[in-house]
Amino acid sequence: MFSLALAFGITACAGTAGQSGDGKPAESGASAQEKNAQYEGQLQDKQAMLENMFNGFLSAVRNGSDAETLYGFLTDTSEYWLDTLENHAKVYNSEALDTCQFYEAYTIILYRLYEREHLWETDEDRMLFMMLSKSGMLDRFTNLPLGPMKVKNDRGSIGLAKSPEVPIMIFEWDDQNWKLNLPETVPLITKGIESIAVKKNWNGKKLALYWIEKEYHMTYSRLDESLLEPIGF
């Protein structure tokens, strides 16, 4: 946008300096219009590509695609983040969990619940599948009515239909394709829940354990502080 503003500025200055008979100011104006049209066309192309990517992502999640396919929809930072969280789930004790944000503590505790209850359907990439499998953390939100995709330069987003201006998923353009940024998306998804911690003056760990118990108390027992410690990985 800065380059476009600069182009328009140069055109205006050329116009006030007087016109020669060779028509150059008109050419300059046409060039600016062409650039603007090209920019708008690129935005539309990116918008269409983002929509196609998102539909492909949803299809991959709901059809139980393999890890390689799912990783193909994610940024490199997302893959590193998943690996880091999985390692934390295996080694963090209760004191270490005090340093975590709510969404991190929730993910770690949920991972341990999966481990204790033998819920895994794979021996590898477990954090990935916990996040992205059918009925996983993201699938629950993408089944809600969603608003239109929005693109601004190399960033894309989508919100809920009832509040489309508030993003719940963030995408990044990597020169050829759109990728989902999980480290930025997950905090947006859990933001509404975090208001409980503010009201009750809880840290992220306490809220995470409370929310796990609230979600799963009808299905599993011992949803207590035992999940705050590593459980025999």
Regions found by a protein language model. Give the residues of each.
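Flexible domain-boundary/linker segments
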Residues: 59, 74, 87-88, 160, ...
